[in-house]
């Protein structure tokens, strides 16, 4: 059904040409969604324990506790890896870097991020941007965020302006709020680098 708009004038209203094409194929082609953009979401959480190193976004943060994990336990990078892998439908971090493998024991999560970047390139995707949030009661992360952005951007081969990192507390409510855990959530946008 063709929709018409009416022109308001002092005279009698007259029909305007429809902005909608008459051919259904032409109309549908204007709204065809190509798989050129993909969105992924990732999250990670680690219990904190005394005597462990706290590393977030590839940055060592002085603190008396750190994550209990097979690798370095960088929850921020783990969430970003999952978001990127999910956007490209390439599985998850556990599939690519299993905690049952000695190869990844105490490994730097920046290595994971570089490998994920390579996988994305092989699959025909480029990273448009990453947006992440870290939940940690203390220490305050604001002073470390610019360094995190630079390290993450370097590992991903993008500009720091394409990486957003935010920090939140748990307001004393859950395991994060009680200072017992660190949590990270991330969203990533990919673009197809080839048709």
Language-model features: where?
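Pyridoxal 5′-phosphate
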Residues: 165-169
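RNase III-family endoribonuclease catalytic core
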Residues: 34-146, 155-156
């Amino acid at each position: 059904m063709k929709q018409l708009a009416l022109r308001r004038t002092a005279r009698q209203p007259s029909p305007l040409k429809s902005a909608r094409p008459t051919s259904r194929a032409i109309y549908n082609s204007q709204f065809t969604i190509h798989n050129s953009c993909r969105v992924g979401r990732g999250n990670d959480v680690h219990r904190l324990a005394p005597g462990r190193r706290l590393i977030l976004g590839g940055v060592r943060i002085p603190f008396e506790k750190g994550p209990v994990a097979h690798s370095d336990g960088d929850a921020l990078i783990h969430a970003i890896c999952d978001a990127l892998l999910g956007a490209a439908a390439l599985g998850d971090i556990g599939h690519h870097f299993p905690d049952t493998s000695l190869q990844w024991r105490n490994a730097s999560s920046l290595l994971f991020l570089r490998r994920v970047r390579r996988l994305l390139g092989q699959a025909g995707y480029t990273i448009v941007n990453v947006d992440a949030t870290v939940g940690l009661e203390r220490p305050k992360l604001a002073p470390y965020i610019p360094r995190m952005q630079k390290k993450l951007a370097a590992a991903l081969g993008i500009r720091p302006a394409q990486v957003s990192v935010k920090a939140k507390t748990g307001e004393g409510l859950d395991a994060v709020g009680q200072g017992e855990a660190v949590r990270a959530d991330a969203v990533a946008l990919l673009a197809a680098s080839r048709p």
